[in-house]
Amino acid sequence: MSFKFEAEVRSAQGKGASRRLRHNGQVPAIIYGGNAEPVSIILDHDKVNNVQIHDAFYNEVLTIVLAEKEVQVKVQAIQRHPTKPKLLHLDFKRV
């Protein structure tokens, strides 16, 4: 099973910017590792939330399309809301 997500580069940083993203149905994330600089990105919350129920999401290499360039990543960490079924932040590591 392969997973592919469309992402945007995130320009606004901080708690307020992250809250605005979550309120608009998006989730902040970061891609780090490899020989490149870390990149803050924005993903669609519902798309990620619907596929994260599969075990393969955590074990397989995922593809993130960022500025028409594909980046191969694995899930490193996920932060979830303590009482709601919401994702707060995702960390991806380049493969």
Curated annotation (Swiss-Prot):
Residues in the signal sequence: none
A single GO BP term for this record reads:
translation
Q: Which residues form a coiled coil?
A: none
- Which superkingdom? Bacteria
A GO CC annotation recorded here is:
cytosolic large ribosomal subunit
Which keywords describe this protein according to UniProt? Ribonucleoprotein, Ribosomal protein, RNA-binding, rRNA-binding
Which Gene Ontology molecular-function terms are recorded?
Answer: 5S rRNA binding; structural constituent of ribosome
Protein task: This is one of the proteins that binds to the 5S RNA in the ribosome where it forms part of the central protuberance.
What does the subunit comment say?
Answer: Part of the 50S ribosomal subunit; part of the 5S rRNA/L5/L18/L25 subcomplex. Contacts the 5S rRNA. Binds to the 5S rRNA independently of L5 and L18.
Q: According to its UniProt record, which protein family does this protein belong to?
A: Belongs to the bacterial ribosomal protein bL25 family.
- Mind telling me what this protein is named? Large ribosomal subunit protein bL25
**Species the sequence originates in:** Haemophilus ducreyi (strain 35000HP / ATCC 700724)
User: What gene codes for this chain?
Assistant: rplY
